[in-house]
Amino acid sequence: MALWGGRFKQEADAKFKFFNDSLRFDYRLALQDIDGSIGWAKAITSVGILTEQEHQQLVVALKELRAEIESNIAIILRDDAEDIHSWVESKLIEKVGDLGKKLHTGRSRNDQVAVDMKMWCKVQAVVLQERIRNLQHKLVETAEANQNAVMPGYTHLQRAQPITFAHWCMAYYEMLERDFSRLTDAYKRMHTCPLGSGALAGTAYSIDRDALAQDLGFAIGTRNSLDSVSDRDHVLELLSTASISMVHLSRFAEDLIFFNSGESAFLELSDRVTSGSSLMPQKKNPDACELIRGKSGRVFGALSGLLTTLKGLPLAYNKDMQEDKEGIFDAMETWQACLEIGALVLEDINVNVERTREAAQQGYSNATELADYLVAKGIPFREAHHIVGEAVVYAISKREPLEALSVAEFKQFHPVIDEDVYPILSLESCLEKRSAKGGVNPERVREAIEAAKVNLGA
């Protein structure tokens, strides 16, 4: 039975009912709706709407219903209720009779869904932080195991300077750390409870909304009822954080796809996260990474969709706001899955250290070291940059690396170049020189790994 039928003389059209109903997706709020109802029962008992005996009856019934859902949430989807609020109320009435009809006193579905969504978002933030930490653990483990894997670093997808695979892993650790902190910040702003705001103007009963908030795991009640039932900032913040994180995960996946390709062959992804071709027997496709990269779009779409939905809404609640749910539900499931699969991809990754080193030795990635060498000899950097550019052109024409040029050949470009140039052109020297904080110097990378382990409690 609908919660609003008294005003109407005709039944809702079946097509409209399907269009309007939300139980098929907002069933995910079932536990939050029940917990919110338990809190509300206590609040209205405090102002004499319910007796203590009635309060206890309702709480027992609601907890029974909660247990039933936890054992089999699919029972909800067998019903044709309009939404999760209607479903919970109807099941409560089945258990306690007319007493169940008293629970909604002073409450609107507007503040009810607002608190349900905020409670759900709080749970999601915690779960997602756990998934982020798990992927960070895998990145640190992989970094620790591959500190000696020298590889080319890229700009413009061209070999730029030598790095290590460990340094690459720690770059994504840092991105995820920012994602983690954004969730922490978003969670802090979910500390206010909208329940008790009514439809838009507040409740007519003098309940202690701060006490209600604390019963439901919030710090305080919201300060403005109009804002309370209209606010979906917490949904937007989660979607925004998810979108930024999916950018990081997509780049992570793209790097691995490239590193795994035959063109680079820096590493091999495990059979556990790859698939084959129905036609080409030799293929081993990086589908896990490609799906992470591809799924970023649907998360971005959820954020864009909700921003567009909310931008022109007048205060307070409008049915448009029902459109906040499918996007956030899908986006959080997608983000969580991508974090989990990202960690799985790293479990059995096999880095080809010979190939990565060979690639690092190509592409003149030690050219910057030669420029720094000239600077140390008293030549201004801009001039040194030009000299090294000419030397690189010469080496390319000979199809040789810089370190293969003779001293006589080097002196064509500047007379200060001598035998002492060769040690600084080695890959080890290139790495060692980058010793400032955050650099690829092996000791700095080890320090970063140890600091990350402390941060993760490893």
Curated annotation (Swiss-Prot):
It catalyses: 2-(N(omega)-L-arginino)succinate = fumarate + L-arginine. Keywords: Amino-acid biosynthesis, Arginine biosynthesis, Cytoplasm, Lyase. Pfam families: ASL_C2 (PF14698), Lyase_1 (PF00206). Pathway: Amino-acid biosynthesis; L-arginine biosynthesis; L-arginine from L-ornithine and carbamoyl phosphate: step 3/3. Its main location: cytoplasm. Gene3D superfamilies: Fumarase/aspartase (C-terminal domain), Fumarase/aspartase (Central domain), Fumarase/aspartase (N-terminal domain). GO terms for biological process: arginine biosynthetic process via ornithine; L-arginine biosynthetic process. It is found in: Cytoplasm. Belongs to the lyase 1 family. Argininosuccinate lyase subfamily. This is Argininosuccinate lyase. It comes from Actinobacillus pleuropneumoniae serotype 5b (strain L20). The gene is argH.
